[in-house]
């Protein structure tokens, strides 16, 4: 959905050059569109088919020309076609009418459910909230996932990064978080699918319908709005769809005064699209081929995701890590903006520990006694130190064997292996694959369970009893079952 001014105020230009998704458009002298304005091209291609294309102005070239990036394919576009300056940035629909619907970068519904029943729209480009409007009191956000709530708790109104290479479970973790938050907190979510697989978007939509997050019979009862710019779309769409989703979330926060969840999958694809656009616009590449404006591009998106005195946006962003290298400029730049990082490790996934969250690499600014309390803090640190000691002993075990360790170290290894197994958990959204019912574990149960392992109360239980269960009661029940089968 693009702002359409009255006919009298429209300025018309002519397409002079088309190179892939980049257009050069010539306008009358003194009537050049502003940077970030949307241009609209509606014409017929040489085969007689309709073309309806929106492009965003990126550069003013001189000689009355502007360079714009197309938000959809430019097939059939030819020089000489008319382009209209809409006089405003791209705008998207906002409010309750967006819930249960799927949109593209322009805010056009793509779910074949008819037009969106709202006149409320908002431009995708706007300033971040003022410093005086920000809420600064820290508050923990319970997810029901043991490893996250204990070792890297999320902040309400904070920004969380899910870091991991290909195929370690970022999208499944996001789906589980949306499911848990909709059911336990009853909150509204906005999902931004940025440059990911179309199949995953379709699976997510079907999953939401099955779990009731989207109510197919009465869309007004739905809890999520979805905005997609997938892998097959031009870089302009992938670069801007994150802003479209964020604009919808901002309306729920600022106008409806709600606490909103914004999921972005994947923030790396946003950077990647920016890099493609930057190269197409002729800018000199920076480190590892990224755009020279990498820090600015990421900052403009991230600074709008925040808590104000009116409401909060808690953002959970999947971050693909190229070649599992956390020092790559894209994940490294994203790190600077985050309150918590959940790092997914391939080594844990290979062991069958799901979610494959690395308990030593994952961090959170919330894990301090003044925020989470002494008991939580001490338990988390004791778990991490036990796992760290186990990691240090692994080389010795590999060379000399377990029998060469001291009694104390053997006990540490035994408890660490139980902790590692207990950090796994069956997910609601993975029930179809695992055949196990999902578990939501309350924070107090999580802390109590790990305290019992650390204190030695459960030393006599078999290790496999701790694998893929919810709380300690389930561990004991599973242990009894294992013992009875022997």
UniProtKB/Swiss-Prot annotation:
The function of this protein is: Produces ATP from ADP in the presence of a proton gradient across the membrane. The catalytic sites are hosted primarily by the beta subunits.
Q: Of which family is this protein a member?
A: Belongs to the ATPase alpha/beta chains family.
Q: Which domain of life is it from?
A: Bacteria
Source organism per entry reads Prochlorococcus marinus (strain MIT 9215)
Q: Where in the cell is it found?
A: Cellular thylakoid membrane
Question: Topology with regard to the membrane?
Answer: Peripheral membrane protein
Q: What is the E.C. number?
A: 7.1.2.2
| InterPro entries named in the record | AAA+_ATPase, ATP-synt_VA_C, ATP_synth_F1_bsu, ATPase_a/bsu_AS, ATPase_alpha/beta_chains, ATPase_F1/V1/A1_a/bsu_N, ATPase_F1/V1/A1_a/bsu_N_sf, ATPase_F1/V1/A1_a/bsu_nucl-bd
Q: Tell me what this protein is called.
A: ATP synthase subunit beta
Q: Is this entry keyworded Cell wall biogenesis/degradation? A: no
List, alphabetically, the PROSITE patterns matched: ATPASE_ALPHA_BETA
The entry marks the following residues as binding ATP, namely 164-171
Q: Which NCBIfam families match?
A: atpD
Q: Which GO terms describe its cellular component?
A: plasma membrane-derived thylakoid membrane; proton-transporting ATP synthase complex
